[in-house]
């Protein structure tokens, strides 16, 4: 008996998830360190906050077997990420939401934010250093966000950044899930 198109898409989606998870499965035992869960989720197009990761997602993943010593099993991760994807729990913010956030940091309306100010805000999100970006995430963000063509490369022109970011994220997600959606067409 042949699988329905919905079942085929689910099988392909599971394959994409398994492949992404496998990149971080250092020992080959179908587990990853809990610190990698957010990275894998973002790769798969879900963008939870650090507090959601720490307070909701990771505890749920470790709840199945607390003796795993910080290791998350593939089965627990797959179950969680399939629910997140189907319910659109952590889909990326749209460009208007992102622009509104940047405008809060630019009360003068200059159209840019100094990268040092941005570093300060992102390293202490919510007023707590523990909620901020990790150093590697910070350097990756700043490298991507700064205007390299400007005479003052310490500025982040946020409208350009948001346009670039949303286009790149949409393209990545579309490419990643193209096969899982049945190939060919543009993602909705």
Residue ranges and their predicted role:
Residues 60-112, 119-132, 136-188:
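EF-hand and EF-hand-like Ca2+-sensor regions
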Residues 1-63:
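The feature marks the first
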